[in-house]
Structures are given as structure tokens and as C-alpha cells.
């Protein structure tokens, strides 16, 4: 079968190779891949900045945002059958089986020794087929086949917002207005989720208000703001207060500024990564005073557990019902497996690249 691989630590190593098709073992399903989303992690692996090959292998099959169709079920599998649409979760428990991994929450792994499909120590899904234990397979309705690769990134945001709401159970809290920083895939999915929850949502990004990203955000009823026209610091007075802010750019000054700008008793959810490790000048006293005196909270979120994937399925159906075609509009670049390396070279106008395997 065809598979898209990288050599971790080696820049621009992405390539298509032939591999033996995996065989389905007991308790597993063989999945024929339909499509795979491409994200920044895949690009960073190809840049040699990240990624870990499976033990005994010098390459890594990339891709962790895949939807496919069950082709074969192994012995003991009773909850799925050939023809079912499925998505596999990404993170696997650490070998030490820490408390959270034993509790089916490897996204909160205590040791950091977890494995991740297509990222850390396990081959991913950017291939014609993969096998997976039923413990990590989520079923989707057939109508989500063409957008199912969005479930994994959506589950990450779903988790972050769920955890933010859980933190806010510390008091009586009725959020009305949200600010999302960033209009990449995570930012737009956060916009959709918060709009689906009934909040007034403002999405701030660098592209012009006539850009595809702006149009997609506004289809959901959000207000798109070009940061070149309205800087972040001006937004609370003009459009706020913001009860929840989701930071999805990875630009760390925004993360810390959000802690100052969020409403009294509000919460900031940090979903963007900052891999460049740059130093920035900040008024740390200002941030601390604001957080303490106004009872604010901030939390980070990464990966997701099974319940977030399952909630994500319901969320995608709700978004699909309210705004038909909205999820599909995120796919602005499509490639085949043979041309998959091109999917890792996105422009600033691209929202989401997807590799269509079948």
C-alpha cells in the first residue's frame, strides 16, 4: 500500500513509499482510509523539528486526522462491521500506566511517555490502510464521511472549552460573549463550537475581512475582526466584555494579553503552541494583578480523550444542521496520496489541507 512518511529530525524528508498492508488482529479493525487532514504538527515533523519514529524503524508514517471505512473486523469485535465510518483517537497510554492513562485519559498523562499515532512512536494514518484496537475507534454517521477528518482537531477544542466550563463551576456564571484569537482550523472550529453554544463570538485574525477565513467565520454568525484595523487591546471597550477567550494562534504575547483583557471572573483557554521559544517584553505585574484581583482563570489544552471525540460527533452534526456546507468550506486544498507532500506546503490563504486517499 502507499504511505506518506517522514524521517524525524530530517528537514524536507516527506515522501510516498510502498509498505505492506497491515493485518487485522484480534480486537482490531482494518480501516481503509478515506481522507486525512494536514496540520501544523505534520509540517513541523517534515521540518525536522518534531516527531519520533516507532521503535526499530527509521521513518514515521505521518497523519493523525483521518476518517475511514472499516474493511475488516478481527476476532472479538462486535460493535463495528465492514462499511462503518470511523475515526481513531491519537494518543495512547504510557507504558507505566499512570493514574490518568488507567482512567482512559491519556491526554492528561502524568509521565509524558505516552505514544501518539503519526507523531510520537507510532505510525499514523496517512496511508491507504491502518489497523487499530476497538478501544480507540469512534463511529461516525455516514453523512460525516467527507468532513470526518475534522473530528480530531475539533475534539481538541471541544475538550478545551469543556474544561474551561468545568473550571467556571467555581461560581454562578452565565457567559454571553467570547473572543477567539486566530482563524486557522483550530480558531475557526472554536468559533463554530462557541456559536453552536449560543454565545456572541468575535474572531480576531490577521487576514482581511474579505478573506476566505473571514467569510467562513461570519457564515456561523460570528463577527470577524482584522487585527490590522482593530488591534487586540481595543476590543474589550469596543465589543466586550469577553467572558471567555480562546487563544488559537500560538503567539504568546496574545496569550498573556488575553489574561488581562478577559472579563472579571472570566476564563482563558490556551490552545495554540509557541515552538519558537522567543522572549517578549511583558508587564508581568499587570497580568498578575489582573488575574488575582478579578478572579480570572487560564488553562492549557492539548490532545483529547474518547468522550471529547464522541461529543465532537454530536457537535459536527449540530453545526452541519445549522450551517450546511460550513465544515466542508474549511477544506481549501486537496491532494491525493501521490501528491500528499504538496499538502504540507500551505499558503496564508489556505485554511485546511486534506489528503484524499480514496
Swiss-Prot record:
Disulfide bonding pattern of the chain: none
CDD domains: glucose_DH (cd08230)
Record-linked Gene3D superfamilies: Medium-chain alcohol dehydrogenases, catalytic domain (3.90.180.10), NAD(P)-binding Rossmann-like Domain (3.40.50.720)
Binding-site residues, NADP(+): 183-186
Keyword Disulfide bond: no
GO MF: D-glucose binding; glucose 1-dehydrogenase (NAD+) activity; glucose 1-dehydrogenase (NADP+) activity; NAD+ binding; NADP+ binding; zinc ion binding
Cofactor(s) required, per the database record: Zn(2+)
EC number, as in UniProt: 1.1.1.47
Amino acids binding Zn(2+): 39, 64-65, 152
Record's keyword terms, sorted: Carbohydrate metabolism, Metal-binding, NAD, NADP, Nucleotide-binding, Oxidoreductase, Zinc
Binding positions (substrate): 41, 116, 152
Entry keyword Metal-binding: yes
Example GO biological process: non-phosphorylated glucose catabolic process
PROSITE patterns: ADH_ZINC
Enzymatic reactions: D-glucose + NAD(+) = D-glucono-1,5-lactone + NADH + H(+); D-glucose + NADP(+) = D-glucono-1,5-lactone + NADPH + H(+)
Signal peptide: none
Biological function: Catalyzes the NAD(P)(+)-dependent oxidation of D-glucose to D-gluconate via gluconolactone. Can utilize both NAD(+) and NADP(+) as electron acceptor. Is involved in the degradation of glucose through a non-phosphorylative variant of the Entner-Doudoroff pathway.
Family, as annotated: Belongs to the zinc-containing alcohol dehydrogenase family. Glucose 1-dehydrogenase subfamily.
PANTHER family: GLUCOSE 1-DEHYDROGENASE (PTHR43189:SF2), ZINC-TYPE ALCOHOL DEHYDROGENASE-LIKE PROTEIN C1198.01-RELATED (PTHR43189)
HAMAP family: Glucose_DH
Protein name: Glucose 1-dehydrogenase
Species of origin: Methanocella paludicola (strain DSM 17711 / JCM 13418 / NBRC 101707 / SANAE)
Classification of source organism: Archaea, Methanobacteriati, Methanobacteriota, Stenosarchaea group, Methanomicrobia
Amino acid at each position: 500500500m502507499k504511505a506518506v512518511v517522514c524521517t524525524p529530525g530530517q528537514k524536507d524528508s516527506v515522501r510516498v513509499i510502498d509498505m505492506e498492508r497491515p493485518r487485522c488482529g484480534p480486537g482490531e479493525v482494518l480501516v481503509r482510509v478515506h481522507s486525512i487532514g494536514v496540520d501544523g504538527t505534520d509540517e513541523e515533523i517534515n521540518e525536522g523539528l518534531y516527531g519520533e519514529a516507532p521503535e526499530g524503524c527509521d521513518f514515521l508514517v505521518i497523519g493523525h486526522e483521518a476518517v475511514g471505512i472499516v474493511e475488516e473486523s478481527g476476532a472479538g469485535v462486535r460493535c463495528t462491521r465492514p462499511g462503518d465510518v470511523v475515526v481513531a483517537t491519537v494518543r495512547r497510554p504510557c507504558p507505566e500506566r499512570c493514574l490518568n492513562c488507567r482512567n482512559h485519559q491519556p491526554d492528561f498523562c502524568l509521565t509524558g511517555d505516552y505514544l501518539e499515532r503519526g507523531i510520537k512512536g507510532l505510525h499514523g494514518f496517512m496511508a491507504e490502510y491502518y489497523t487499530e484496537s476497538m478501544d480507540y475507534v469512534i463511529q461516525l454517521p455516514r453523512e460525516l464521511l467527507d468532513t470526518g477528518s475534522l473530528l480530531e482537531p475539533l475534539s481538541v477544542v471541544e475538550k478545551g472549552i469543556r474544561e474551561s466550563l468545568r473550571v467556571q463551576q467555581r461560581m454562578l456564571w452565565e457567559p454571553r460573549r467570547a473572543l477567539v484569537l486566530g482563524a486557522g482550523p483550530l480558531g475557526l472550529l472554536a468559533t463554530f463550537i462557541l456559536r453552536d453554544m449560543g454565545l456572541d463570538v468575535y474572531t480576531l485574525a490577521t487576514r482581511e475581512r474579505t478573506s476566505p477565513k473571514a467569510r467562513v467565520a461570519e457564515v456561523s454568525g460570528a463577527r470577524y475582526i482584522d487585527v490590522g484595523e482593530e488591534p487586540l487591546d481595543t476590543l474589550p471597550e469596543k465589543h466586550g466584555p469577553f467572558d471567555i477567550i480562546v487563544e488559537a494562534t500560538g503567539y504568546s504575547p496574545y496569550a498573556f494579553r488575553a489574561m488581562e483583557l478577559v472579563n472579571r471572573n472570566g476564563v482563558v483557554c490556551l490552545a495554540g503552541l509557541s515552538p519558537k521559544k522567543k522572549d517578549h517584553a511583558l508587564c508581568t505585574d499587570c497580568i498578575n494583578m489582573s488575574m488575582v484581583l478579578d478572579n480570572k482563570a487560564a488553562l492549557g489544552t492539548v490532545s483529547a480523550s474518547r468522550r471529547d471525540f464522541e461529543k465532537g460527533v454530536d457537535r459536527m452534526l449540530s453545526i452541519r444542521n445549522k450551517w450546511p456546507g460550513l465544515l466542508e468550506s474549511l477544506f481549501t486544498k486537496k491532494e491525493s496520496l501521490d501528491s500528499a507532500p504538496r499538502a504540507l506546503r500551505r499558503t496564508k490563504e489556505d485554511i485546511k489541507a486534506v489528503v484524499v486517499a480514496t
